[in-house]
């Protein structure tokens, strides 16, 4: 269980690091150290997860335990993507709309079109805006809004990782009596000889 906790801690540091490092002018190489730490954490936590989950499951029920673990992992991944995607794109839209509202001379319809283009392209439209000198100031605002949205999404992910780390502290302590759980007689036949 220690390896899983260590992995989650590395993931937490890596994701929070993204929130700290990312900015409108951040070079790609500046994210490499925190992404490395995050990747190390994923490797440590994910590789051990099935074994940790199945450690307390009787051999006869290992298929159910493995299936439950796999389903929980898939539901968690899908929920995380949905939540963080919503945070990212709603923050991007809100921040960019607010910034564009401060520029006189841009009609509301055009502001909406810019925000929609940036959101629907997941930021790819920013490069097109930056290429035209007339829209370069808008591109700078869009970069800033995208950075703010990315930071908030990263800190939200770090929050959920912190919850996971705290929850993991309640696991792996053995039974309430402090004794190692015993394999019932019906499970001993399928568990194989004792070592």
Where do the language-model regions lie?
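A surface-exposed, glycine/aromatic-enriched loop/edge motif typical of exported proteins
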Residues: 99-118
